[in-house]
A protein has these predicted regions:
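Interfacial segments of alpha-helical transmembrane regions
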Residues: 6-22, 86-95
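Alpha-helical transmembrane segments of multi-pass integral membrane proteins
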Residues: 107-146
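Juxtamembrane helix-break-helix junctions at the cytosolic face
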Residues: 72-89
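Intrinsic disorder/low-complexity segments
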Residues: 143-157
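Transmembrane alpha-helix/helix-exit interface in multi-pass inner-membrane proteins
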Residues: 21-42
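A loop-to-helix transmembrane entry motif
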Residues: 51-71
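Membrane-helix boundary connector in multi-pass membrane proteins
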Residues: 85-89, 93-96, 103-121
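Perimembrane loop-to-helix junctions flanking transmembrane segments
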Residues: 40-55
Length: 157
C-alpha cells in the first residue's frame, strides 16, 4: 500500500501537483515583472559568451501562451502520473528536470546581474519541487525493480 500525503494523493502525485502550482506561481511572477522584456538582455549577455546562443525577443502574448500551455500540461497530467502511466512518468521526469534547471538559471542570473531578475523570488520553489519529484520517481523506480522478480538465466535465454 502506498503512503498517502495531503489530499489523499501518493507522494509522487502530490509533489508533481505541487510542481505545477509552483510553476504557476513562478509564471505569475515572471509575467508581472516582465521577464519577456528582460529575456532580450539575458540572452544578449549569454550570446556574448556563447555566440551560438541567439539573442531572443519574446512578445508578452507568446510568453503567456508558452507558460499557460506548460502549466496546463503539468496540471492536466496529474491524474496520469497518479495512474503511473509510463508516458506521464516520463513527462514528470522531464518537467522536474526542466524546473531544477529553471530554478538554477534564475538564481545564477540574479548572481550574474547582481540583483533581482524576473522569476528569482519563486525560483527556489520550482527548484525544490523539481528535486522532490525526481527523488520520488527514482524511489518509485527502485521499488518497482525491487518487487520485480529477477529472471533466472534459463528464463532470459
Amino acid at each position: 500500500m502506498m503512503d498517502k500525503s495531503a489530499l489523499g494523493l501518493d507522494h509522487l502525485t502530490f509533489r508533481f501537483w505541487l510542481l505545477g502550482l509552483a510553476q504557476a506561481a513562478h509564471s505569475i511572477e515572471e509575467t508581472f515583472t516582465r521577464l519577456y522584456d528582460f529575456f532580450w538582455v539575458a540572452t544578449g549577455r549569454l550570446h556574448e559568451i556563447v555566440p551560438a546562443i541567439a539573442q531572443t525577443r519574446m512578445t508578452p502574448r507568446t510568453f503567456a501562451l508558452l507558460n499557460m500551455s506548460f502549466i496546463a500540461i503539468l496540471l492536466g497530467s496529474v491524474p496520469f502520473v497518479r495512474a503511473r502511466k509510463p508516458l506521464a512518468l516520463g513527462l514528470a521526469g522531464i518537467a522536474a528536470g526542466i524546473e531544477v534547471l529553471n530554478g538554477i538559471g534564475h538564481t545564477a542570473g540574479a548572481i550574474w546581474f547582481r540583483g533581482y531578475v524576473p522569476g528569482v523570488a519563486t525560483a527556489p520553489f520550482v527548484f525544490v519541487t523539481g528535486v522532490l519529484v525526481l527523488r520520488e520517481l527514482i524511489r518509485d523506480a527502485g521499488e518497482v525493480n525491487a518487487l520485480t522478480p529477477s529472471l533466472s538465466r534459463k528464463e532470459r535465454e
